């Protein structure tokens, strides 16, 4: 504001004062100071306000005194003087002297951008005050000039809301919205002043275009003043681009083209092509984005244009342009891919080595285009021709698995007749020239497609054609074996007797040596044929193994996987153990193949293979992949001796933190052997399976999970013995364990591992066990450890201290021990420890959590104290369980203490702050879960708590995660505890949901917005599904909620995703299709149906409001295509319940654009949304 550095000396007489004010050296802030002291002036100065106003008008009219226009003091004084003068006639006379329009335009132009950051726009208020006295007329050009300067300031506005307000004020001042007709002169003026600043703002805006209302407003201006049928916008566009080429950036050009795409109809594709060409010539790098935009908006251009563009790209030396544009061109028009397939295939072959991903993408698009055009059979003819002409270099197109997969997944589009004609044509070609491998590859592709998804009828129809493969003459191509094998994979009974008789010839000839290139297919053929008839496989096995041994490691692994997975039974029953062992050795070289094999449970039926596999894995126990594989093998398949050896090997060294080792041990111990070292020797078990306290704590610190929460190998072995405690071997082991831990805990400094073992054993002691005293010893020892820590505070004592507290908590909560005699001692110890922590200002989160668990059991009837303590520690799931346990124990004494805590929690919503909000919400949820049905006061307090949350919470003090937790809980309670929700509560939840939606969409990131939006919509959905009867006479509430939700989607279209719109569509559908209706009063069979009919009749009268809102938003805001598609089922559900009478009412209510949109919407519903019997 330009504060004075020293106070201005004000004259004490009117003459000098007026002279000071009139002085050209007097600055605006000095005039402001004088005016602010008018009330204190003792000098007689009549009409001083009129004098100063006249002076300001003179200064504003002076083109050399721009500092008056840019000073806030000027406009603040101006407004204040207008309010101070009580003579409207005098004001009008003065204001007529003001060159209002030029001053306004000049002020918008000069106003400092840094003042917009502080939302300081005092001049606008003054301008509106002037409008109260005078009618300010702007010419079209003057309006556009002022808006030009206003738009230039938008990017400096701190928020999008403020930017919209600033722009709207400028529009209101100029009355630009009153310009109803547009001609070439107005359009030229718009291009001169407003178009470039608008594009500049589009490029600078950081918010999503679809949710930025200023963006939408400026786009509307472009459509209104430029893109009108009576305007030669093509000429203006060309001139604008030429004149401003140096200033138009890539983003500006993109948004410029995007606006043309938005406002021009599908019939204007010729104009779009011209604009594309003009902008593309200036910004070639944007052509890809332009095409993407056309694809996303479902706007197209002519096939000729796309063809010319494709040919240009294919001839281009700019490889990046080719790679980026071609896929989009092919997506826009399938005919382009079909027509230019050979040029595209050459491109694929050329780029395959340099950019295989690009090549495969183009390949997919070519196939997709032919499939969509129902010309897949023609594609086979074209690829046959191309590969036959190009030779082996092109065979990857029909032989590489990825390329083949692209074809096979589209073969379902072929009809039975097409299948027959295609296969017959390929077989005729093979019969004519069996040396050409191309038709054989194509037949194999067809066979893969048949095996994947062809109908039984199709398979039966093509079977006679495929059977010709076995009878073809002059079939010398070595690929024949692969082809016959694949046919046998599709059909079980297709092999003719003559083919079966050939096997002796095949096995005895030198064919295995002469077809080395495809010998594996020949072996597969022989193995498959062996499943049809019995013959001696010895020679084939020898030749197969001889071939197998000469392969490199990778091919060995792949071949062994293929053979074992395809012919498991044959390999199991016919190969020797040495041969199977060799295959398994190679198979284990590839962990991916191994994992795939183990996913098929049938392999475990083959005993020889399973035996070899387990032995190989057991001998590789030091490798992680072997342990992970062993876990996948059913324990019944692993021999007991192998399990014993494995357990001993895995525990031969000190305990390892490797999770795979632990998981494997637990898997092996799921069927106990009672013979391994750790199962027969208690010392060995403790030494090899119990972590030292230091290791346990270090691991829990890394994984944020306590060791006791994990599966314990020690516990597994111990409980295995407990399950057969009367067996001699287990009885001896258990007695040994009891004696050892008793002896260790009787010492003042026992072995830490044995102490931990004693703590574990104490949890499993039954009341009638003669060693029950171990529990008392464990509790006493744990207390002694706590006391030792409180006295020494040595870091090495922390691990055992934490484990001791965890043990105490588990023993007490499971009812296995009495801690009452140690209560006061433990409380004193905790007080001592916490005082030490606070005095040293050291934070010990894990220790405090463990102390909280034990403390929660010792402070009886002090729920508020425990819950307050909970809010001051770091949260874990264990702490939640402790709170729940405390509440349940308290409720056994009655609900009074519980209700008092619930009341305090409810009233605390008004004072909650974000640091502890999430934990506070957890507290409220834990309590709410334990409100009993007969606790009427608890029901009331629950409603009060939700009301307090609705009234006082916002996103900044409450936090997004807290909201998510609360609404997830509400959603759960709506179903599990419906009696908690009164009529008042349900009606209050609706605005609570809307308030929360508004907070989330305006303050969170995109992912969080969508997650929160869906969550809250599901809450409303649950309210409707479970509590619909409470809305019997409240449909107007639900209509209002749905309308506001649709508005939120429209405003935040670019932020909210299709999943969010899907949730809204489900909500609307459930609203229109009631099915959860109580029928307790009448048991008649047709009563439920009549109730649903009555509800639908009531909804039908009210739901028109929702449909009207959707139509209005679709016209004014324009939902994106994805959002509109997702909302469609909900809109169709509304149409489902409307009668012709309601449709007529709606049509009469709508304006002309609304009627047109409604008609199109209804036609779409009848076409794709309305249920039909066919």
UniProtKB/Swiss-Prot annotation:
UniProtKB keywords: Nucleus, Ribosome biogenesis, rRNA processing
Main location: nucleus
Localization in the cell: Nucleus, Nucleolus
Membrane spanning stretches: none
Single biological process term from Gene Ontology: rRNA processing
InterPro entries according to UniProt: Ribosome_Biogenesis_Reg, Urb2/Npa2_C
GO CC terms in record: nucleolus; nucleus
Assembly and binders: Component of very early pre-60S ribosomal particles containing 27SA2 pre-rRNA. Interacts with URB1. Together with DBP6, NOP8, URB1 and RSA3, forms an RNA-independent complex, which is required during early maturation of nascent 60S ribosomal subunits.
Physiological role: Required for 27S pre-rRNA processing. Has an early role during 60S ribosomal subunit assembly.
Something else known: Present with 1660 molecules/cell in log phase SD medium.
Protein known as: Nucleolar pre-ribosomal-associated protein 2
Organism whose genome encodes this protein: Saccharomyces cerevisiae (strain ATCC 204508 / S288c)
Designated gene of the protein: URB2
């Amino acid at each position: 504001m330009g504060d004075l550095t020293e106070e201005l000396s004000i004259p004490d007489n009117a003459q000098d004062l007026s002279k000071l004010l009139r002085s050209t050296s007097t600055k605006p802030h000095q005039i402001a100071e004088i005016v602010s002291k008018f009330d204190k002036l003792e000098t007689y100065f009549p009409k001083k306000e009129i004098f100063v106003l006249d002076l300001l008008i003179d200064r504003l009219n002076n083109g050399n005194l721009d500092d008056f226009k840019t000073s806030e003091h000027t406009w603040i004084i101006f407004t204040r003087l207008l309010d101070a003068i009580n003579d409207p006639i005098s004001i009008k006379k003065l204001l007529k002297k003001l060159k209002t329009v030029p001053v306004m335009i000049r002020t918008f132009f000069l106003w400092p951008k840094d003042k917009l950051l502080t939302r300081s726009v005092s001049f606008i208020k003054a301008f509106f005050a002037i409008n109260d006295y005078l009618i300010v007329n702007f010419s079209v050009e003057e309006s556009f000039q002022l808006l030009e300067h206003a738009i230039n300031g938008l990017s400096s506005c701190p928020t999008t809301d403020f930017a919209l307000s600033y722009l709207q004020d400028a529009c209101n001042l100029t009355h630009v919205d009153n310009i109803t007709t547009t001609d070439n002169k107005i359009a030229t003026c718009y291009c001169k002043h407003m178009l470039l600043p608008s594009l500049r703002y589009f490029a600078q805006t950081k918010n999503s275009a679809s949710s930025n209302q200023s963006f939408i407003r400026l786009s509307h201006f472009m459509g209104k003043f430029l893109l009108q049928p009576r305007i030669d916008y093509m000429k203006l566009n060309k001139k604008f681009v030429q004149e401003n080429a140096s200033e138009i950036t890539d983003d500006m050009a993109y948004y410029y083209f995007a606006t043309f795409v938005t406002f021009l109809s599908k019939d204007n594709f010729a104009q779009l092509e011209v604009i594309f060409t003009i902008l593309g010539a200036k910004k070639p790098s944007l052509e890809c984005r332009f095409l993407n935009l056309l694809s996303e908006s479902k706007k197209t251009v002519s096939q000729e244009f796309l063809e010319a563009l494709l040919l240009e790209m294919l001839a281009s030396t700019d490889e990046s342009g080719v790679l980026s544009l071609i896929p989009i061109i092919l997506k826009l028009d399938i005919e382009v891919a079909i027509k230019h397939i050979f040029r595209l295939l050459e491109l694929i072959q050329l780029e395959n080595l340099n950019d295989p991903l690009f090549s495969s993408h183009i390949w997919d698009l070519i196939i997709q285009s032919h499939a969509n055009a129902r010309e897949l059979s023609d594609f086979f003819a074209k690829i046959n021709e191309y590969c036959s002409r190009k030779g082996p270099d092109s065979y990857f197109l029909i032989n590489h698995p990825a390329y083949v997969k692209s074809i096979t997944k589209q073969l379902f589009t072929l009809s039975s007749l097409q299948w027959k004609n295609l296969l017959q044509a390929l077989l005729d070609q093979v019969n004519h020239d069996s040396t050409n491998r191309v038709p054989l590859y194509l037949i194999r592709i067809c066979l893969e497609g048949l095996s994947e998804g062809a109908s039984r009828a199709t398979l039966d129809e093509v079977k006679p054609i495929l059977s010709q493969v076995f009878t073809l003459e002059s079939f010398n191509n070595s690929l024949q074996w692969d082809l016959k094998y694949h046919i046998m994979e599709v059909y079980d009974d297709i092999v003719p007797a003559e083919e079966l008789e050939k096997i002796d010839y095949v096995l005895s000839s030198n064919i295995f040596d002469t077809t080395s290139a495809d010998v594996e297919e020949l072996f597969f053929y022989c193995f498959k044929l062996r499943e049809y008839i019995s013959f001696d496989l010895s020679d084939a096995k020898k030749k197969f193994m001889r071939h197998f041994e000469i392969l490199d490691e990778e091919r060995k692994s792949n071949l062994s996987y293929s053979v074992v997975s395809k012919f498991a039974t044959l390999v199991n029953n016919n190969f020797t153990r040495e041969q199977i062992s060799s295959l398994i050795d190679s198979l284990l070289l590839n962990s991916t193949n191994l994992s795939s094999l183990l996913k098929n449970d049938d392999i475990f039926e083959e005993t020889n293979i399973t035996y070899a596999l387990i032995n190989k894995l057991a001998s590789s126990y030091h490798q992680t992949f072997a342990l992970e594989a062993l876990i996948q093998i059913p324990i019944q398949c692993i021999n007991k001796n192998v399990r014993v050896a494995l357990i001993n090997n895995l525990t031969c060294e000190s305990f390892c933190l490797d999770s795979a080792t632990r998981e494997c041990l637990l898997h092996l111990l799921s069927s106990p052997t009672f013979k391994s070292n750790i199962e027969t020797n208690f010392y060995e078990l403790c030494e090899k399976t119990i972590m030292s306290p230091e290791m346990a704590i270090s691991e829990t610190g890394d994984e944020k999970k306590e060791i006791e929460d994990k599966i314990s190998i020690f516990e597994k072995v111990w409980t295995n013995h407990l399950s057969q405690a009367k067996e001699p071997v287990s009885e001896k082991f258990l007695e040994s364990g009891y004696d050892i831990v008793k002896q260790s805990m009787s010492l003042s400094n026992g072995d830490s591992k044995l102490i931990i073992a004693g703590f574990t054993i104490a949890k499993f002691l039954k009341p009638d066990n003669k060693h029950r005293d171990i529990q008392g010893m464990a509790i006493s020892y744990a207390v002694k450890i706590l006391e030792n820590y409180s006295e020494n505070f040595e870091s090495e004592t922390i691990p055992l201290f934490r484990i001791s507290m965890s043990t105490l908590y588990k023993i007490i909560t499971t009812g296995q021990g009495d801690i009452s005699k140690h209560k006061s001692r433990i409380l004193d110890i905790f007080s001592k420890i916490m005082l030490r922590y606070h005095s040293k200002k050291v934070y010990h989160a894990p220790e405090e959590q463990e102390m909280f668990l034990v403390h929660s059991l010792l402070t009886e009837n002090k729920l508020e104290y425990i819950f307050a303590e909970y809010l001051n520690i770091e949260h874990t799931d264990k702490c939640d369980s402790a709170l729940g346990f405390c509440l349940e124990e308290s409720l056994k004494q009655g609900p009074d203490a519980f209700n008092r805590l619930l009341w305090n929690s409810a009233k605390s919503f008004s004072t909650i702050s974000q640091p502890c909000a999430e934990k506070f919400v957890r507290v409220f949820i834990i309590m709410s879960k334990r409100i009993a049905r007969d606790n009427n006061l608890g029901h009331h307090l629950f409603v009060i708590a939700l009301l307090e949350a609705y009234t006082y919470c916002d996103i900044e003090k409450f936090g997004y995660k807290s909201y998510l937790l609360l609404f997830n809980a509400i959603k759960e309670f709506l179903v599990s505890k419906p009696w908690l929700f009164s009529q008042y509560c349900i009606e209050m939840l609706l605005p609570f949901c809307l308030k929360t939606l508004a907070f989330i969409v305006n303050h969170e990131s995109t992912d969080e917005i969508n997650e929160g939006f869906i969550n809250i919509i599901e809450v409303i959905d649950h309210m409707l599904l479970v509590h619909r009867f409470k809305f019997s006479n409240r449909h107007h509430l639900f209509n209002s909620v749905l309308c506001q939700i649709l508005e939120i989607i429209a405003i935040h279209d670019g932020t909210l995703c299709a999943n969010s719109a899907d949730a809204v569509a489900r909500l609307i559908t459930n609203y229109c299709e009631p099915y959860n209706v109580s029928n307790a009063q009448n048991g008649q069979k047709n009563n439920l149906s009549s109730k649903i009919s009555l509800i639908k009749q009531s909804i039908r009268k009210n739901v028109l409001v929702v449909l009207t809102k959707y139509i209005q938003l679709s016209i004014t805001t324009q939902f994106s295509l994805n959002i509109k598609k997702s909302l469609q089922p909900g809109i169709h559900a509304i149409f489902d319940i409307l009668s012709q009478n309601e449709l007529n009412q709606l049509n009469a209510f709508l304006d002309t654009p609304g009627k047109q949109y409604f008609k199109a919407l209804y036609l779409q519903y009848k076409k794709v949304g309305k249920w039909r019997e066919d």
